[in-house]
Each structure stands twice: as structure tokens, then as C-alpha cells.
Amino acid sequence: SPVNQVEFVKKLYDEKLPFSKRNMQIVKNVMLSQDGFGYEIHSKTGWTREKGFNIGWWVGYIQKENGSYFFATRLLQNRNSNRADFGSCRKDITKKVFKELHIINF
């Protein structure tokens, strides 16, 4: 669930998972997907097909000087109405929300 995804990402961020701190830092570095504009986005995408639906995820956190913001976006699409932009809209929708909340500016 999205809640479980955010809880997991928070544990990774706080380095409270049952792995070495070094390995958790490596994972966080690999998850760095955008840097600049006064913030970093650390994230991971996912996509599966289940019961006639495409299910797309974008999970991670935005790190700014004044704090961090965690997110999990899950989109469902009926496979009978495939849209070419389904893969990119996970990120686009999430970024628009954070922009409207004045958390990011790009």
C-alpha cells in the first residue's frame, strides 16, 4: 500500500532498517533522481500488471534544507485504454502537487 511504501522509505531515510548504514547510504545515493533548484528527489519507480490493470508507482522523498517530504504515488490504468504517457504521469502528477504546495518550484 502507499502507506507501507512511505513507512519503508522513512525507515530508509532514518537508517532504521536491518541493513548496514553503508548499504542504506548507497541505496539513498542510487535513488537520487533529481538534484538542483534547492532540493533533491530520492525516488524509485515501479510498474506491474494485475487483473487487467497497469499499476504504476513513484515512491521517495524530497529533501530540502528546511526538511524532507515523503511520497508514494500509485496510479491504476485499465489495460484496455492504454495511454502512452502512463509511465511518465506518475512523476508529473506528483511534481505538480508538490509545486502547488510550494515545496518545489520546477
Regions found by a protein language model. Name each.
Residues 6-106:
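Structured C-terminal helix/loop/strand segments within mature extracytoplasmic catalytic/sensor domains
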